[in-house]
């Protein structure tokens, strides 16, 4: 049976949010095949919701999402390069194909984001609870960032997740 969820307005949720802020992100599963250049997309996606909300299956899907986000930037770069060509060297068939691939990949990315619930009711419960958990996470990160460089800082921050 699944563990009972912590109330988003509890002190335990605030403590978990501070732990999440100290860790900042989650490393991708080594067996999932995240492209090196897709790491910025990975970290942005992972930070989109509370770190303790990610399941192992979500992390695998997040790798696919990050790789697709990288791939769409490559396709857009190729499209811009082809669109700059003038005259007989311009390949309209390739341009049309690239545009089609971009649209299809955008749809895939949107579906993956919905599935991951960078809004998922199935993994994270009611959306009102997820909204509060995400707010707790943002508040904890802001507090950490405001106070971490102060020499006379009296706020205790966890050093390890």
Swiss-Prot record:
Question: Its domain of life?
Answer: Viruses
Q: What is known of its domains?
A: Contains a helix-turn-helix (HTH) doamin that is involved in viral DNA binding.
What segment(s) does the record annotate as region Helix-turn-helix (HTH)? 37-60
Coiled-coil parts of chain? 88-115
Oligomer and partners: Homononamer; forms a ring-like structure through which genomic DNA is translocated into the capsid. Interacts with the terminase small subunit; the active complex is composed of a pentamer ring of terminase large subunits and a nonamer ring of terminase small subunits. Binds a specific sequence on the viral genome. DNA transits through the central tunnel formed by the small subunit and sequence-specific recognition for packaging initiation and termination takes place as it emerges.
Q: What name has this protein been given in UniProt?
A: Terminase, small subunit
Q: State the taxonomy lineage.
A: Viruses, Duplodnaviria, Heunggongvirae, Uroviricota, Caudoviricetes
Q: Describe its function.
A: The terminase small subunit binds to the packaging initiation site and regulates the ATPase activity of the terminase large subunit. The terminase lies at a unique vertex of the procapsid and is composed of two subunits, a small terminase subunit involved in viral DNA recognition (packaging sequence), and a large terminase subunit possessing endonucleolytic and ATPase activities. Both terminase subunits heterooligomerize and are docked on the portal protein to form the packaging machine. Packaging initiates by TerS recognizing the packaging sequence in the viral DNA.
> Which of this chain's residues are annotated to bind DNA?
96, 100, 107, 114, 128
What family does the Swiss-Prot or TrEMBL record give for this protein? Belongs to the Hendrixvirinae small terminase family.
Q: Does the keyword Coiled coil apply?
A: yes
Q: Does the keyword Kinase apply?
A: no
Provide this UniProt record's keywords sorted from A to Z. Coiled coil, DNA-binding, Viral genome packaging, Viral release from host cell
């Amino acid at each position: 049976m699944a563990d009972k969820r912590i109330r988003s307005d509890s002190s335990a949720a605030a403590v978990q949010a501070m732990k999440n802020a100290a860790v900042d992100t989650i490393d991708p599963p080594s067996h999932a095949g995240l492209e090196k250049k897709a790491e910025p997309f990975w970290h942005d996606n992972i930070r989109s919701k509370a770190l303790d909300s990610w399941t192992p299956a979500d992390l695998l899907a997040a790798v696919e999402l990050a790789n697709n986000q990288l791939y769409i930037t490559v396709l857009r770069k190729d499209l811009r390069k082809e669109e700059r060509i003038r005259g007989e060297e311009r390949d309209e068939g390739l341009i049309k194909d690239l545009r089609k691939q971009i649209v299809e990949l955008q749809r895939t990315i949107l579906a993956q984001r919905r599935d991951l619930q960078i809004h998922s009711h199935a993994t994270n419960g009611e959306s009102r609870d997820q909204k509060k958990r995400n707010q707790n996470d943002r508040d904890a990160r802001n507090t950490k960032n405001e106070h971490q460089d102060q020499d006379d800082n009296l706020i205790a921050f966890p050093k390890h997740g």
